[in-house]
Amino acid sequence: MTAPGHGLESLERRGLMFVLSSPSGAGKTTLSRLLIERVAGLKMSVSATTRTKRPGEEDGRDYYFVDHARFQAMTENAELLEWANVFDNCYGTPRAPVEAALAVGQDVLFDIDWQGTQQLREKARDDVVSVFILPPSAADLEKRLHTRAQDSDEVIRGRMSRASHELSHFAEYDYIVVNHDIDEAFAEVHSILKAERLKRERRTGLTAFVRDLQKQLER
């Protein structure tokens, strides 16, 4: 039974933005899927985009589908936490649903590149926890890209070239995980999330809780 005064409910916390980045083929997408499937209190960030909706996609679940004029207005009105132009289509993270989730203690998972991470950090540094996923070797990364059988050899060469540039930003991240084995990598990433959830500064009612404990001890 909880004693009178500030109880366990006062240990509520603010949510966090949990960012995973990696070169293509290093395991970021798989790890994101496993986190969403296995970890309570974590939801995937939903991006706004100007690209055309594909069959089977649902507005608000897969993306927020908007036209170019609306997207431009969102950027001008600071409604996006981060955004980028990719092959003439714009993608960005709406600020309002993320901030609403954080306010009630829900964590939001981001599967974005170093540029998006940089923008998030500039706008909300205290809420961002970033993890960069590394492959164990260049040979292993290339093998994974070929195993996916999604791209031509030319596209794979391009991805390998971009990977070198992406790796140059590893020091901008809070944590580094080398994905030798997907289960081990998941365990490490999950451990990071669990530890970050327990940080003192995210426990919004902790001061009141401790003061109440002190009063109880002094009676």
Swiss-Prot record:
Protein name: Guanylate kinase
Catalytic activity: GMP + ATP = GDP + ADP
Domain Guanylate kinase-like: 15-194
Pfam family for this entry, one: Guanylate_kin
InterPro entries recorded: GK/Ca_channel_bsu (IPR008145), Guanylate_kin-like_dom (IPR008144), Guanylate_kinase (IPR017665), Guanylate_kinase_CS (IPR020590), P-loop_NTPase (IPR027417)
Organism for this UniProt entry: Rhodopseudomonas palustris (strain BisB18)
HAMAP family according to UniProt: Guanylate_kinase
Taxonomy, superkingdom: Bacteria
Protein's gene: gmk
PROSITE patterns xrefs: GUANYLATE_KINASE_1, GUANYLATE_KINASE_2
